[in-house]
Amino acid sequence: MKNEIKKFRTKLGITQEELAEKAGVRRETIVFLEQGKYNPSLKLALNIAKELKIPIDKLFSLS
């Protein structure tokens, strides 16, 4: 699954640590997500989309 987490996170000026804290995960989880090494649960994907103020379909794609 491809994601645009880093793009939108940096656009908002949010660090990985800040996003992790707001989403309720460790910073390493955000690192793995951004590197494409981990696919989030639906709950985590929704939490991240909410914190980044981006519709989930703009944040994640199957291609």
Annotate the PLM regions.
Residues 17, 28, 57:
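Key DNA-contact positions within bacterial/archaeal DNA-binding proteins
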